[in-house]
């Protein structure tokens, strides 16, 4: 289940990740006219110009084990793509009319209100599904948007109501689903939610958005499977010791936030939605698509960062609904450090933090050698005593 966002030359191999998440900006995928790097694609009698995707295909082939050095698919990794929509003047028609405010946020909600935009996305998702549906360049998990309930920060939607937002998102989700599934029936499609479960810090609460989305999907396309890409950061984001937070993250669906401490609330709630909507038990899958803990290099936070990454991984490892645990960054991000977040396994000068070797060995026979020294830090006598179903014999990765 161990994963990382992005690809780092040398370190992707060394850490031994089994899951890799990549971001794709849809604004880079579309051109309004023929130009270098874009290819014509005719769909339902209309010709569009979409990015050739050569570089991304090469990356995904490498991750799937089909690069020139390993032509027989060795060391295959599961690839997750997150599809985002930034602002480009000439492509503003692809952004929902209520959200067309340049500079309002990093990413915007898609336009399902106007026919030209809908047709473009339908064609684009079919094109991408074809390119990334072959077993050599297969994308296993597709996520539409980033933290879509956070509609004032990551999925800007202007003044749209919750029901309008969820319905518009679900319509785009259905287009992506059909585009992906027509080529790769085993690939999964995910909704992205932040850690605000009942709190609405930057838009709507995750639970409210999920409920609206699930209801709309059931009413309009009940046969479609959907899954959840969750970001269970601590609250606040700078808190590493998630295990001792008894205020923001509590037991029960009434909790304000969901972190790795109480991630079971999410997975149990999804089980209840399966029952409500007649879905097969266990069919709604979860990936932890973004997570990180902060540590300035050389400071004591290195210990809590390492402990948190490992403890969280163990929790995910023994939750049968969670398929992946994907950490935010190999290297501290300059934009994030300006906000006090040092989420990388390295600092900007490639100083290796303690978390690097811990994370590297979490799914090996040496896992406990690296994690047992942190038992006292997290206040546990053993991992079995704090993690239901913990079995050290199941920690080493298989089928890698």
Residue ranges and their predicted role:
Residues 1-28:
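Boundary/entry segment of secreted carbohydrate-active catalytic domains
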Residues 4-14, 121-131, 206-216, 306-314:
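Short, acidic/polar
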Residues 4-6, 22, 144, 191, ...:
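Conserved beta-strand positions
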Residues 18-199, 235-236, 332-337:
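Substrate-binding cleft and catalytic face of glycoside hydrolase catalytic domains
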Residues 38-40, 134-138, 152-153, 163, ...:
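Aromatic-rich peripheral "rim/lid" segments of glycoside hydrolase catalytic domains that contact
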Residues 51-58, 113-124, 168-172, 205-209, ...:
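Soluble or luminal CAZymes and related metallo-dependent hydrolases
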Residues 118, 140, 165-299:
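Noncatalytic carbohydrate-binding groove/subsite architecture in carbohydrate-active enzymes
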């Amino acid at each position: 289940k161990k994963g990382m966002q992005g690809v780092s030359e040398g370190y992707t191999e060394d850490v031994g990740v089994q899951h890799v998440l990549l971001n794709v900006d849809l604004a880079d995928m579309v051109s309004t006219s023929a130009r270098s790097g874009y290819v014509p694609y005719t769909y339902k009698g209309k010709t569009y110009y979409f990015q050739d995707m050569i570089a991304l295909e090469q990356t995904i082939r490498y991750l799937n084990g089909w690069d020139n050095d390993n032509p027989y698919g060795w060391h295959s990794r599961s690839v997750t793509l997150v599809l985002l929509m930034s602002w480009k003047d000439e492509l503003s028609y692809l952004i929902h009319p209520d959200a067309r405010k340049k500079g309002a946020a990093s990413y915007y909600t898609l336009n399902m209100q106007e026919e030209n935009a809908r047709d473009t996305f339908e064609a684009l998702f079919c094109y991408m599904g074809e390119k990334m549906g072959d077993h050599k360049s297969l994308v296993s998990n597709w996520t539409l948007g980033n933290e879509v309930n956070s509609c004032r920060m990551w999925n800007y939607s202007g003044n749209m109501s919750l029901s309008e937002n969820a319905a518009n998102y679900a319509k785009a989700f259905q287009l992506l689903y059909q585009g992906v599934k027509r080529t790769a029936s085993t690939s999964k499609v995910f909704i992205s939610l932040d850690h605000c479960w009942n709190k609405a810090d930057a838009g709507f609460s995750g639970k409210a958005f999920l409920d609206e989305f699930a209801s709309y999907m059931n009413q309009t396309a009940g046969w479609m499977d959907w899954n959840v890409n969750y970001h269970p950061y601590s609250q606040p984001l700078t808190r590493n010791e998630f295990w001792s937070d008894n205020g923001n993250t509590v037991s029960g669906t009434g909790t304000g936030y969901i972190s790795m401490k109480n991630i079971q609330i999410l997975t149990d709630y999804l089980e209840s939605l399966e029952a409500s909507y007649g879905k097969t038990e266990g069919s709604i899958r979860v990936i932890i698509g973004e997570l990180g803990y902060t540590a300035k290099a050389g400071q004591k936070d290195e210990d809590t960062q390492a402990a948190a990454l490992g403890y969280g991984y163990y929790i995910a490892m023994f939750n049968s609904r969670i398929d992946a645990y994907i950490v935010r960054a190999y290297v501290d991000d300059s934009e994030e450090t300006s906000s006090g977040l040092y989420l990388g396994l390295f600092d900007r000068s490639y100083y290796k933090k303690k978390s690097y070797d811990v994370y590297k060995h979490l799914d090996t026979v040496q896992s406990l050698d690296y994690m047992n020294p942190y038992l006292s830090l997290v206040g546990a006598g053993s991992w079995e005593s704090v993690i239901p179903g913990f079995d050290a014999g199941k920690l080493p990765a298989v089928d890698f």
